[in-house]
Amino acid sequence: MFVARFIGSPLMNMIAGRTGPNGIELDGLEARPVLSDLADVEAGRPVFLGVRPDDLRVAFAATDKVFAIDARIEVIEPLGPEILVYARAGGQELVAKADSRASLNRGDAVRLVADADALHEIGRAHV
């Protein structure tokens, strides 16, 4: 997990969860369970789901993305053609990207989405 958090800026989002019968269930967050190849692992084991800010995007319409989580914007950081969106979901801070033309404000409720191939199970050796 150290390497996943150490490399890249901004840091990789690390979302705590547990193995469940339908995949990884995220602690304290309203989100669909994330499909996983941990089906053979005892349910309830702790695991982290890592997703880089470059891969976590603000959705402005209905989406078929595998990972979707509702959050509230705390900070917006303009970066030219894109903006970094610092949002809170449950007790966890997440960093995502959005197009700089998007009309986003502090306090807005947003849906953050990512493709399945952008999700990384971290700490599986400890599961």
Stretch-by-stretch model annotation:
Residues 1-23:
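ABC transporter nucleotide-binding domain
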Residues 8-13, 43, 79-81:
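Short flexible coil/turn linkers enriched for glycine and charged/polar residues
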Residues 2, 56-58, 94:
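Short beta-strands and strand-coil junctions in structured, solvent-facing domains, enriched
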